[in-house]
Amino acid sequence: MALDNATVLERLRAALPDAILGSAEFRGDLSVYVRPERIVDVARFLRDDPELRFNFLENLCGVDYLGREPRFEVVYHLISFTNRSRICLKVGVDEHNPSVPSLTGLWPGANYHERETFDMFGIIFTGHPCLERILMPEDWEGHPLRKDVPLGAEEVAFTFNQDRIYAHKPFAKE
């Protein structure tokens, strides 16, 4: 039977009251806002608590909220197959010191997710065993999923707009 969100939140707040900044529920899914320095403690508690048993890290990702403080957020989705329940943990990450502790010690599968988040957003996962780029070339400058990265794409030429686009190209015309 699925765990009630209120029960999960109550157990979490009772065990780690100083780690929780807030919570929200949307369409039946519980999100808990966690202090960055306490994410490992919260994740370990959710994994190891005999009643909760959120023992599967489904994924984690970065989000860029340009213009908001904190600018970045790392979002973790955990599943308890035993209790048929999910929980979302959200950690705010400062733009000027974009770091959060790594969860690879709890879930080795976090390795590639954290590397991708580092590569795309520049969020540093302290304690990660091999925090290197995973998608972009090693000599790539910047982090392409940040919202302040300039878009340098060219408009694609189709039959309806090719004359306008080709008029600005430096190649020879027939």
UniProtKB/Swiss-Prot annotation:
InterPro entries: NADH_DH_suC, NADH_quin_OxRdtase_su_C/D-like, NADH_UbQ_OxRdtase_30kDa_su. It is a peripheral membrane protein. NDH-1 shuttles electrons from NADH, via FMN and iron-sulfur (Fe-S) centers, to quinones in the respiratory chain. The immediate electron acceptor for the enzyme in this species is believed to be ubiquinone. Couples the redox reaction to proton translocation (for every two electrons transferred, four hydrogen ions are translocated across the cytoplasmic membrane), and thus conserves the redox energy in a proton gradient. It catalyses: a quinone + NADH + 5 H(+)(in) = a quinol + NAD(+) + 4 H(+)(out). Keywords: Cell membrane, Membrane, NAD, Quinone, Translocase, Transport, Ubiquinone. Pfam families: Complex1_30kDa. It comes from Roseiflexus sp. (strain RS-1). NDH-1 is composed of 14 different subunits. Subunits NuoB, C, D, E, F, and G constitute the peripheral sector of the complex. HAMAP family: NDH1_NuoC. This is NADH-quinone oxidoreductase subunit C. Its EC number is 7.1.1.-. GO terms for molecular function: NADH dehydrogenase (ubiquinone) activity; NADH:ubiquinone reductase (non-electrogenic) activity; quinone binding. The gene is nuoC. It is found in: Cell membrane. One of its GO terms (cellular component) is plasma membrane. Disulfide bonds: none annotated. Belongs to the complex I 30 kDa subunit family. It comes from the Bacteria. Its main location: membrane. It is an enzyme of class 7 (translocase).
